[in-house]
Amino acid sequence: MNPNQKILCTSATAITIGAIAALIGIANLGLNIGLHLKPGCNCSHSQPETTNTSQTIINNYYNETNITNIQMEERKSRNFNNLTKGLCTINSWHIYGKDNAVRIGESSDVLVTREPYVSCDPDECRFYALSQGTTIRGKHSNGTIHDRSQYRALISWPLSSPPTVYNSRVECIGWSSTSCNDGKSRMSICISGPNNNASAVVWYNRRPVAEINTWARNILRTQESECVCHNGVCPVVFTDGPATGPADTRIYYFKEGKILKWESLTGTAKHIEECSCYGERTGITCTCRDNWQGSNRPVIQIDPVAMTHTSQYICSPVLTDSPRPNDPNIGKCNDPYPGNNNNGVKGFSYLDGANTWLGRTISTASRSGYEMLKVPNALTDDRSKPIQGQTIVLNADWSGYSGSFMDYWAEGDCYRACFYVELIRGRPKEDKVWWTSNSIVSMCSSTEFLGQWNWPDGAKIEYFL
């Protein structure tokens, strides 16, 4: 083929390709015009696709707004919880929650906490604790053995998950706390400040409502577990004064975070700290810590309707504080049983006549092991003894604070008793690490006679070195 023929051939090919492209373009144009001008369309809209998209977004906005309004109406329609039921029969305890926080914290960003508890809303139950404003692996964890600092806050997080920066919700700022839901919303109280000038801020529905100033200028403090409400009235026990001598305890009565009244401690209890409370049959029972003299636990019984109370000690000779002497043959109902040497640990009990259970560390000298003992009529019988028991944590494993809680919104004709145990790790007992933190195990009652198992923290301290 000579050069002229090559040029002609190339030109013909180009013309053919161009013609095909033009035909495709014309076909596309015709198709689009046909689609846009189909019968029944509103031809005044020059950009119907854009208009349809906008309408969809507007409709979604309306739907989301309606859902939000429905949720708000549901909250408004909720009523105050009333303590109308009694306790369910307790024959044993089943596992309810465990967060394995220290084990997971060996390789993840888990927050340093202590003084944990569990508390329920109508929709869910959550873990609570006082964080230290740092993670277990963080350098600021050095020194977290100290109870009171500007970096502590009451946080909550999903049941059985470890507390992290990502899943925790700050309820209020402070180094001592309590929190409870009245059926309509949650009240949280945090105490902060220096030892001689601390104050409490009362939050309701996530807003600050009231404040309480120190009255004895000696470490104003409160329950370190949930409070309980009846018909909107939520009593809370506060103490201000020496941990090893006469202190000034008051019971405050709140409604929607506002103070209705307060009264000084009455009855025969001599020293009150860190009360663990539960409610049933319109009454509230709080089992507390006598850090001054008693190895037996003081009890405050509160009438939230009359807004009055009385106090005594658990009569049973089964002593439940730690440290403590060996159990005597006869207990004391109105006086502390000596032997705890100006020390103690937060604890709890369910005092329900023949259905009574007491919790305590297995060790009489330290915070290790944990057991539940069925002691009928322990509140009133100074010779009552255990007839049944269940080990929760073996004595070879560390324990700590413990407290009561209940899901008052669960279905059924009785309240299921529940409790948690703090599993402390790190200092002071394990001083190869610089931090002090904990995990949580929680149990609830069963009418069945279930088997028992050991529920330790499970972290190996050598993995942190």
For the regions a language model picked out, list residue spans one by one:
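Entry beta-strands of beta-propeller and related beta-repeat scaffolds
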Residues: 124-129, 185-187, 198-200, 233-236, ...
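Extracellular secreted precursors and ectodomains with disulfide-bonded cysteine-rich loops/domains
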Residues: 39-41, 86, 118, 123, ...
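Beta-propeller blade signature
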Residues: 152-158, 251
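Long, low-complexity intrinsically disordered regions enriched in small/polar
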Residues: 42-83, 90
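An edge-strand/N-cap motif at the start of beta-rich repeat modules
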Residues: 81-107
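Repeated scaffold domains used in trafficking and secretory/extracellular systems
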Residues: 108-117, 173-179, 183-189, 218-226, ...
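Hydrophobic, helix-forming membrane-interacting segments
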Residues: 4-42
